[in-house]
Amino acid sequence: MERPQLPQGLPADIEDKKAAAKAWFESLRDTICAAFEAIEDELTGPLSDRPAGRFVAKDWLREEGAGGGGRMSMMEGRVFEKVGVHTSTVFGEFSPEFREQIPGASEDPRFWASGISLIAHPVNPNVPAVHMNTRMVVTTSNWFGGGADLTPVLDRRRIMTDPDTVLFHRAMEIACNRHPVADHAKFKQWCDEYFYLKHRNEPRGTGGIFYDWLRSAEELGGWDADFAFTRDVGKAFALVYPRIVRTNFNKPWTEQDRNEQLVRRGRYVEFNLLYDRGTIFGLKTGGNVESILSSLPPLVRWP
C-alpha cells in the first residue's frame, strides 16, 4: 500500500485548500504573462525596432521517486531581457538534513507545496529588476509565505525617495493594510533583513515585503484570511510593476548605465546562489534545476 501523500491529522478540507491555492497561483501566472506581453507590444523608444517578446511555456515533472511538477514560462524580449514566471506543485519527503529547518517536518517528513515565482531582468537600465513569489506549504502544519521586492540597478535611483520605490512600497503597504493578519512594518523589515548581501554589507535593492510561516489564528480568519492576503500581494504586484515599467521603458540610457546594470546583476547572482531560501529549497527537494536557476540574469559583469 502506498504511503499517504500528506501526514495524518490535517484539516478535513485540506485538499480543497490545496486545490484553491494551486488554481490561484496558475491564474496569477497567466495574468502576469499577459500583462508583460502587452508591455512588449507598447515599446516605442530604444529597441522598438526589434520584435516584441512572447512567453514560451515548458512543463516539467520532478525526477523519478518524487512527485509533482510545474510550468516554466520564459520570455526574452525588447523590454524584458529575461523574465521567468513559474508555477509548481510538488510533494514528497524532505531529506533528513532539511527536516529540522521546515516547521512540522521533523515530526513527519512528508510535504506538499505549491506556488508562483517571478523574476524580471529588463533591458533598459532605467527599469528596475523585480522579484515576486507566493506559496503554500503543507507538512504536519500548513502556512503561506512570499513577498515582492524591487531592485533598481542605477545607483542614483537606489534611494528610498525614488518615485518607483515609493510607488512599489505604497502598493505593498496598501495590500498589507487591508488584512489584519498582515503587518506591513514587520514584513518590510523582514524583507530588508532577508534581501541583504552580508559579505558586501549592502542591500540587494530598495525592498518591499517578505513573509513566511503565516498561519493565523482562527479568530483572525485562519487559512481563509491568510489566503486572501496572499492573493492581494499577487494582485498588487500585477498592478504596480507594469506601471513602473511603463514609466521608464522608453527612456534613453548610456553605456555607463548599462555597465552599472550588469555590475548590479552580479550582486543579484551572488545573493541567489549564496542566500536565497527558495533556491536552496528547490535544489534540495528535487526541483527543476533549469527553472530554479532561471532567476539568474542573462548577462552580468564583475568589475
UniProtKB/Swiss-Prot annotation:
Query: What does the subunit section of this Swiss-Prot or TrEMBL entry state?
Result: Homodimer.
* Family the UniProt entry places it in: Belongs to the aerobic coproporphyrinogen-III oxidase family.
- Which positions are annotated as binding substrate? 117, 133-135, 286-288
The record lists the catalysed reaction(s) as: coproporphyrinogen III + O2 + 2 H(+) = protoporphyrinogen IX + 2 CO2 + 2 H2O
Q: In which pathway does it act?
A: Porphyrin-containing compound metabolism; protoporphyrin-IX biosynthesis; protoporphyrinogen-IX from coproporphyrinogen-III (O2 route): step 1/1
One GO BP: protoporphyrinogen IX biosynthetic process
**Top class in the EC scheme:** oxidoreductase
InterPro entries the UniProt entry points to: Coprogen_oxidase_aer (IPR001260), Coprogen_oxidase_aer_sf (IPR036406), Coprogen_oxidase_CS (IPR018375)
Q: Which PROSITE patterns match?
A: COPROGEN_OXIDASE (PS01021)
- UniProt entry tagged with the keyword Oxidoreductase: yes
Name the job this protein performs.
Answer: Involved in the heme biosynthesis. Catalyzes the aerobic oxidative decarboxylation of propionate groups of rings A and B of coproporphyrinogen-III to yield the vinyl groups in protoporphyrinogen-IX.
Entry EC no(s): 1.3.3.3
Annotated residues that bind a divalent metal cation are located at 121, 131, 169, 199
Region: Important for dimerization, residue numbers: 268-303
Q: Does the keyword Metal-binding apply?
A: yes
Q: Which HAMAP family match?
A: Coprogen_oxidas
- State the disulfide connectivity: none
Annotated site residue numbers, Important for dimerization: 199
Q: What keywords is this UniProt entry annotated with? A: Cytoplasm, Heme biosynthesis, Metal-binding, Oxidoreductase, Porphyrin biosynthesis
Q: Where in the cell is it found?
A: Cytoplasm
- Any idea which GO molecular function terms this record carries? coproporphyrinogen oxidase activity; metal ion binding; protein homodimerization activity
This chain's source organism reads Rhizobium meliloti (strain 1021) (Ensifer meliloti)
Q: Name one Pfam family in it.
A: Coprogen_oxidas
The name this protein goes by in its record: Oxygen-dependent coproporphyrinogen-III oxidase
Domain of life of the source: Bacteria
